[in-house]
Amino acid sequence: MDDTNKIIYAFVTYTLLMLVYTAINIPYSALGGVLSGNPNERVSIQSYRFVFGMLGGLLVTSCTLPLVKWFGNGNNEMGYQLTMLVMSCLGVVLFLICFRYTKERVSNPPHKLSLKTQLHVLWQNQPFKILCMAALVLLTSMVLRTTLAIYYVKYVLGKEDLITEFVTLGMIGNILGCACAQPLSKRLDKKAAYVYLQYISAILSCIAFFVPNEHVLLAFLVYFLWCFFTQMATPLLWAKMADTIDYGVWQNGLRLTGLVYASIVFFIKLGLALGGAIAGWLLAYYQYQANVELSEATKSGILTSFTLYPAIGSILVALIMTKYNLDNKTIKKITADLTQKSNL
């Protein structure tokens, strides 16, 4: 197979992989809204989900190259193929176990409404629209920053040999942040906590802008704290999705679980794409070229793109979420009303 056909093959198979994965991930994500009707338990569910998901990511990152070496025995091409095959089979088994042994505790009565009607009804759900906008801006700014992390370490800090340590430290911060979401939600209103966390993320991003290049340990610490506080908000966001579903039931009697999660996941995927694209556009704008000595202006552009632009994104998310009207008091009322109706 020549190089052109290899590229076409890689593009087609990767696109199909993402389509299938998204088709699996939407009902998997929606499980968080039907495993429990308790808003606090939903935060706990999402915390466990993201902690173990990120641990899995860390495990894959750590094990991939050793497995490639072991399976390939000198043939890296064969090593990668067999490693991906093993990981894919393991993923399928884990998905099957998940769907086989989870039990939905929130009923989702069937209805015969057309997709057009469902979308019209969903568009009346104001909290849902707020979450869509917040998810889009949030993921765009997060992906922008994480994409540029390696460029920041290599060109701004001048420590290419520490890229792996920098990224790994960020992943550890992500895991610890997700684990702390549940204790935080018990002490603060979920809406207020989410807004505060966005402002903290913005402040930490701005602090990173002023960290001198020679203070590598401080740069690592600030990035760790940014990952910690940013990811602490992630389980709260996913728990809020279930709250907007309950709001829709309370508002019009329709539980559109699948459509809500599918729609918000669409905006999340759009944010992922935009964040990666904007990172590339900014690198081009600041005249980045690989494997050459970069000008101070280019390095300054990378620093600004890694710190200040994501900070603006976090502030925008916080401002958007101030319009979100489902605080803990409102959610408790909605939950009580729905429980009373279900008992009639």
Regions found by a protein language model. Give the residues of each.
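Membrane-embedded alpha-helical bundles of multi-pass transporters/translocases
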Residues: 1-344
